[in-house]
Amino acid sequence: MSEADIPDPVAPQRVTPAMRARLERIVGRAPEVMVKITGRTKDAGHLKSHLEYIMRNGDLTAETEQGSLMHGREGLKDLQLRWTDDTVLDDKRRRDGSVSVNIILSMPPGTDPIAVKDAVRAFAIETFEANHDYVLVQHLDDKHPHVHLTVRSQGYNGKRLNPRKADLATWRERFAGELRLRGVAAEATPRRTRGKVRKHDKGPVVALRRRGVVPDTDKGAREEVVRAAKAGTAGARPWEEKARERQAKIRAQYLDHARELERTGKGSDRALAMKVREFVAMMPDPETRREQLIRELSWMARRTRPDQDRAPNCGDTGPGAKTR
């Protein structure tokens, strides 16, 4: 739980300064940080290859938890030797255990890359310095300024790094906070806070769609929807009902905050309350991928029926339209 989520102990319904600041960022659509675990290295050879990749075979400089800068091919070799030697000595690692956890921290195009790297450095110090070796390398060959952070799984205390979903949420909050300290507008809200119920599609799937290729996952999802429709079992699923209930509560909470802001009588609070109401009004319909497919396939089925089977003068709303 972040400071912005902690209610006022005296007046629990009051919008605290931290909550107000976060509302400003959310309705102002501050850029969302990305903190993602890209993978884990499994052995010394895998680790060496990963370090070669993030350092571009020595063309990029790496920075360690001690602040040491590793330059060029020699720096890359020194880093590889140090980490692989430690891997051999790590007799507590299971044969299928990881050697490192590989993380990427990124911001949208146009973000100051110096601020991004400084924020990642501060994040790494606070999160890992006390218990883990790590190395960070910034990449500037992409429109999104980002830093690769590779952390040794084996901690100084003998415990292994095994981040969970809650850890990633904390890491996002921390990274966003470090960016704000450096003057960069940044937020780390969950998708559901922005009215989204669907997970982001994986990179390879998105790439296939851009090339006009239908991914196997899309084919399978469509086939499942068609089978369910034929069997008469295409109704709402329990998790979809829960998602809608959750979204209703989130939107109600936003409106509660808006009413509380309006009660203060301050012009700035009334202005923010109006923005909050507009934000809620613009939130997307909490539609899952399955529900979207059902709607699209239903529309396509109506379009392909003979003209006499369609009601006259009713007009087509299309797969993306909403009826009143």
Enumerate the language-model features and the residues they cover.
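N-terminal nicking endonuclease/strand-transfer module with a His-rich metal-binding environment
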Residues: 1-324
